[in-house]
Amino acid sequence: MTARGSVERLTSSSGEPAWLVSGYELVKELLADPRLSRSHADPRHPVRMTQPALFGGPMGDPDAEREDHVRMRRLLTRSFSARRMESLRPRIDRIVGQVLDGMETGGSPADFHAAVSFPLPGLVMCELLGISEPDRADFLRWSEDAIHMEHPARSRAGLQSLWRCLGATIERKHAAAGEDVISDMLAAGMADPAMSDDAIAHLASGLLFAGHGSTAAVIDRGILLLLTHTKEREALQRSPGLAPQAVEEILRCPSPLERPRANRRGGLPRYASVDLEAGGVRIRAGDLVMFALQDANEDAGTFRHPAHFDVARQENPHLAFSHGLHFCLGASVARMELQLLFGQLLGQFPMLHLDVPLEQLRAKAERSPGRAVEIPVAW
């Protein structure tokens, strides 16, 4: 352990040995270290972080991972450009309005997770990817199944259904392109032989999972933080222009449903491509390394009063979207939908409150830390 952080041995959720990196400076440094990658030299026998079909183990070719990743980001530059994001804003705003109106029409009380947190980011990703509206309900259900951490068979079945849907969508886009990510990738693929339909489906599924399950967890976290911190909720309600700062603080802070800080496990699996030293310990090639992002985001050496939820916090260099080569490509989309949601929510539902004590809520541990089984609310 050093003043900049620590690297400790632990057992991953899959029951296998791993290293856990803690501390803001060390986490940030190692996230940008090219010796730690998402691929593994022996992908058939790696240590796994969790058991879901998509995210629990390695991804990519160890001999070409960096080159492939740089090419992928270059191909998607147009899809996530400032111009495209601004063109998306009214469409995302419409989806936010439809989701909130749907909860209001359903009446009080409601399950906020089922009415808002789960459908909203999935619908936004469907809009971004170009998934047809008739397919979206099934698409969201398969997405939920695919990230089941405790049921590998269900996870695999959900992933296979998603791939079939993506394949059909790609076929349609070959015939009639639109202003969406899949169409952009098909156009870029005309000049890049490596961009096969399977490669495009793989990239699209990665974008979906990055933008759906994780953003649903942030929305769950955000509503619970706001409804359990009266002064901060009132500040945002009085000044919806605080939504950008509030969203950054929601991204930084832990959910009220998460374990105490000392008991949290890490996320973001990486594999050492060579032997290396970090935090005073020796990490061997092939070892699984995980990052305690939440610990880093509460590091008192970086954040003033880190345990305080402050919707007006000004300096907030959190690592919720990772850092370095693998910084979240869809961060701008996630920020936009979160800002639109939390900028509108309390104006439309000024009396919104939890309908049960916080202690009665249960985290959805088998899917994503901090996500709730349900969030009963009333207004």
For every predicted segment, state its role.
Residues 1-379:
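Cytochrome P450
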